[in-house]
Amino acid sequence: MDRESAIELVRGLVAIPSLSRQESAASAWLVEQMRGAGYDRAYVDEAGNAVGELGDAHASRTIVLLGHIDTVPGNIPVRIENDLLYGRGSVDAKGPLATFVAGAARFGSAAAKAAGLHVVVVGAVEEEAATSKGARFIAKRFNGTNAPAPGACIIGEPSHWNRITLGYKGRLLLDFTADQPMAHTAGPDASVASVVVDFWNWVTAHAAKANEGKDKVFDQLSPSLRRFITSANEEIHDVVDAQFAWRLPVGFDAEQFMTELRTVASGFSRTTFDLKFRGYEKPWKGDRNNALVRSFLAGLRTVDASEKLGFVLKTGTSDMNVVGPVWHCPIVAYGPGDSSLDHTPNEHLSVDEYWKAVNVIEETLIAWSA
């Protein structure tokens, strides 16, 4: 796949709307592109993922390039101006996904077969939702029983073409309601809103204590208040509907923490809490001393010997949090683009950077297969 074809690939993919749970058109289109680019097998799987494979499915080694094909909402007119591709998903994360598709195509079926390597490229669905449906399906498929477990994995997320991401913090979401019988505001009892504020203050104090002596944000417990709505119901109760969220550091005991939260909530005598935890993802941090990282070092040097590979730890989550704890293989995230543009109305990707990243993926696969 040459530069012009690779650019048409990413532009075409970005031009197809694919909100979470609405990815079918983009998945079908990408499968056709992979078939045309020489993939041995390309199909939409049961989860809705776009999947392309190079080499023998029963090869001695498997590497999974796991991108995601869904985006957050936002209508940004798709265009290329002054080397910049504008459009929703150009950075997060159709640019990285197209990088995988094009880079693996350049590596090619013949090279994969000669090296005894099975290359699997995935455009996963629902990464932007808390479900990560596509990644969970792939994690179960390549579990060592249904299909050989991968020897390495690359997650498709923007980190610039000359950097790789080694880890992501975990996540926990708490949706809850708190209600209590109505009372006069001049009375002695605290309002339900005040009670929830006290609950939130406990959360922030707990985080402050947990973070003592930890200077790096990646190592800290980071709570956020995402929703706080007061109302009254037909039972003459005052109600708060709220959501708390946490970014979790490596080694954090989420089960114990949820037990603590339940205990604190049950301690407010007049207030009934209904807590619903969801969206838990385990934090994950990979090693930088392994064959996959060395392959990236070799790939980057081949593309541009003057560049040095950078290493990043991120405070959000990605599908690395889903598959890392299952596969326990060397894993990094890679992709062109500035992640500060994720989800913004000005989202855009440098075409030149994208092409460099395509070549880095090709050369990394060559180094990995050696």
Predicted regions mapped to residue ranges:
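Metal-dependent amide/peptide-bond hydrolase catalytic core
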Residues: S159, L172-A370
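Buried hydrophobic packing segments
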Residues: L30, L97-F107, A135-I138, V196-F199, ...
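Acidic-glycine-rich active-site phosphate/pyrophosphate-binding loop
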Residues: L66-E81, P150-G151, G167-T177, V332
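Short, surface-exposed alpha-helical segments at coil->helix boundaries
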Residues: I7, S24-A28, L97, M258-R262, ...
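Acidic/histidine-rich catalytic neighborhood of metal-dependent amide-processing enzymes
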Residues: A98-R171, S369-A370
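Acidic/His- and Gly-rich active-site-bordering loop/insert found
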Residues: M1-S90, G108-G116, H328
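Short, conserved micro-motifs enriched in small and acidic residues
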Residues: L85-A98, A105, A190-A193, H348-W355
